[in-house]
Amino acid sequence: MLRSFPLFIGLRYSLAQKNSLLLSFVSLISVLGVTLGVLILIVALAVINGSIETLRKEALKSTPHVTIAGPGLQANWRELRDLALRSEGVIAAAPFIEAEASITHQGEAAFIAVRGIDTALESSVSEPGSATFVDLLASLGESETGVILGAGLAGQLGVRSSTQVSLLSLGKLLRRRLDEGQGAEVIGFADFGLYSNHNTALMSLTAAERLFANDPGVDIRLRLRVSDINRAGDIAAQVFSDYSELEITPWNEVQASL
């Protein structure tokens, strides 16, 4: 009885007699208004969910699923990587260093994040990329001074493949050690996602260690790729439960808005 009462009221006012045309009209308009409002809400939620998913994919092109940092990692990152690879939920793990630097080309300059990577392992922890990106990583591993720039950054600086650029770590720049910059050859460009295309460059781990030599706070970290990004933090916490000194940062803390 209670379930049919609202239906009874709706039909009563929508199907009123001819002497109640105004009431029927108002009721009909109200029903149509509610229906249209619900439809707009459904469409808006679908668009928002789709946009968030797109932004998440763009962010994960450059943001690690999980970043592991902390004292002692410099010395035993290989053992910790092996531990991660033996653990359930971890697909791949690779070392990297990352710090800020200035890049200069023909009077154009920008401050960027330079990431030093293990070129043999990077493709395993990155979001699935094109065959071109895999080839670029192979070329980067063969070059002592090579660098891969974000496509947006390359356009901003007006550089092409095989162009020479100058790099200087932010630490050395602040200490006015301008003579310790190093040259690098642009071997190609990559899509690092919406958030990083204009401010990211990749170098080999060895070249990046030379660039940031003697800069404080630039230490090796581990990057993990996990099977379930929604549980990234929990998976890493289980893997390194015996290492309380390590700092575990999942992607959704770095990109909290997503």
Predicted regions and their residues:
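Alpha-helical membrane-interface segments at transmembrane helix boundaries
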Residues: 15, 33, 48, 52, ...
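Hydrophobic, regular-secondary-structure patches
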Residues: 39-113, 123, 134-143
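Hydrophobic secondary-structure segments that place a key small or acidic residue at a functional site
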Residues: 97, 135-206
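N-terminal Sec/SRP start-transfer signal
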Residues: 1-39
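Cytochrome P450 core scaffold surrounding the K-helix E-X-X-R motif
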Residues: 120-129
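Short amphipathic alpha-helices in soluble, non-transmembrane regions
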Residues: 79-85, 128, 235-243
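Mechanotransmission and gating elements of multispan inner-membrane complexes involved in transport
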Residues: 174, 178-258
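Envelope-exposed proteins and targeting segments
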Residues: 62-64, 89, 108-113, 145, ...
